């Protein structure tokens, strides 16, 4: 058992950590680039806001994922209450995943609108303002927080004795058994979100 844990740790350290480090570094560079560009030009287009928002989401997504995967990072995070720690990190990670899907969809749609010809029905959307884009981004945050809020009730730190009914999340966090209603509602909301936004993404990419 100890050898298995050691092997798993080595695999994670040698494979996952470099990918996370590169991803966070690349997205930080993109975020800073767009911030400096806006500071220089003082003009913020709807597509610029979306492009700036996406690397921020990816940074948070990778960071929370790294904490969940790494025992060292999880234990070093300065919160003594493991229950609160599990809930916050898992909740943020799932919200970031959903917001990433929504923001990527928005970016794809905005790009399709930008390159659409004047005869296209998308022409009337070319004058969309940055306020509309900001409104959609805020909506995507609220939507995904609503979809994911059940995790705040069911995520718990690893108990001393792990029952067969608990669902493994990480070495430190497990999911309590859900009722059929909770489980079905959570699944339906996630599937609907993914189908709608990924579907719009595919349609707009095909249009472009």
UniProtKB/Swiss-Prot annotation:
<feature type="topological domain" description="Extracellular">
    <location>
        <begin position="70"/>
        <end position="97"/>
    </location>
</feature>
<feature type="topological domain" description="Extracellular">
    <location>
        <begin position="1"/>
        <end position="19"/>
    </location>
</feature>
<feature type="transmembrane region" description="Helical">
    <location>
        <begin position="20"/>
        <end position="40"/>
    </location>
</feature>
<feature type="transmembrane region" description="Helical">
    <location>
        <begin position="49"/>
        <end position="69"/>
    </location>
</feature>
<dbReference type="Pfam" id="PF03402">
    <property type="entry name" value="V1R"/>
</dbReference>
<feature type="topological domain" description="Cytoplasmic">
    <location>
        <begin position="119"/>
        <end position="135"/>
    </location>
</feature>
<feature type="disulfide bond">
    <location>
        <begin position="86"/>
        <end position="173"/>
    </location>
</feature>
<keyword id="KW-1015">Disulfide bond</keyword>
<keyword id="KW-0812">Transmembrane</keyword>
<keyword id="KW-1003">Cell membrane</keyword>
<dbReference type="GO" id="GO:0016503">
    <property type="term" value="F:pheromone receptor activity"/>
</dbReference>
<comment type="similarity">
    <text>Belongs to the G-protein coupled receptor 1 family.</text>
</comment>
<dbReference type="InterPro" id="IPR017452">
    <property type="entry name" value="GPCR_Rhodpsn_7TM"/>
</dbReference>
<keyword id="KW-0807">Transducer</keyword>
<feature type="topological domain" description="Cytoplasmic">
    <location>
        <begin position="205"/>
        <end position="208"/>
    </location>
</feature>
<comment type="function">
    <text>Putative pheromone receptor.</text>
</comment>
<protein>
    <recommendedName>
        <fullName>Putative vomeronasal receptor-like protein 4</fullName>
    </recommendedName>
</protein>
<keyword id="KW-0472">Membrane</keyword>
<dbReference type="InterPro" id="IPR004072">
    <property type="entry name" value="Vmron_rcpt_1"/>
</dbReference>
<feature type="topological domain" description="Cytoplasmic">
    <location>
        <begin position="41"/>
        <end position="48"/>
    </location>
</feature>
<feature type="transmembrane region" description="Helical">
    <location>
        <begin position="136"/>
        <end position="156"/>
    </location>
</feature>
<feature type="transmembrane region" description="Helical">
    <location>
        <begin position="184"/>
        <end position="204"/>
    </location>
</feature>
<feature type="transmembrane region" description="Helical">
    <location>
        <begin position="98"/>
        <end position="118"/>
    </location>
</feature>
<keyword id="KW-1133">Transmembrane helix</keyword>
<dbReference type="GO" id="GO:0005886">
    <property type="term" value="C:plasma membrane"/>
</dbReference>
<feature type="topological domain" description="Extracellular">
    <location>
        <begin position="157"/>
        <end position="183"/>
    </location>
</feature>
<dbReference type="GO" id="GO:0019236">
    <property type="term" value="P:response to pheromone"/>
</dbReference>
<keyword id="KW-0589">Pheromone response</keyword>
<keyword id="KW-0675">Receptor</keyword>
<keyword id="KW-0297">G-protein coupled receptor</keyword>
<dbReference type="GO" id="GO:0007606">
    <property type="term" value="P:sensory perception of chemical stimulus"/>
</dbReference>
């Amino acid at each position: 058992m100890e050898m298995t844990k050691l092997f798993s740790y080595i695999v994670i350290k040698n494979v996952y950590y470099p990918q996370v480090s590169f991803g966070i570094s690349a997205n930080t560079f993109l975020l800073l680039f767009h911030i400096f560009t806006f500071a220089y030009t003082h003009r913020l287009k709807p597509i610029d806001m979306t492009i700036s928002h996406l690397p921020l989401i990816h940074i948070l997504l990778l960071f929370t994922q790294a904490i969940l995967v790494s025992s060292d990072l999880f234990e070093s995070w300065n919160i003594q209450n493991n229950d609160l720690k599990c809930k916050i990190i898992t909740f943020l990670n799932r919200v970031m995943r959903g917001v990433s899907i929504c923001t990527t969809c928005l970016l794809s749609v905005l790009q399709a609108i930008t390159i659409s010809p004047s005869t296209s029905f998308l022409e009337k959307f070319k004058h969309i303002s940055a306020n509309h884009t900001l409104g959609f981004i805020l909506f995507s945050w609220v939507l995904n927080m609503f979809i994911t809020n059940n995790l705040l009730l069911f995520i718990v730190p690893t108990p001393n004795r792990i029952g067969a009914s608990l669902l493994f999340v990480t070495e430190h966090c497990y999911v309590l058994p859900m009722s059929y209603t909770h489980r079905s509602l959570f699944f339906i909301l996630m599937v609907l979100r993914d189908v709608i936004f990924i579907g719009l993404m595919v349609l707009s990419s095909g249009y472009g």
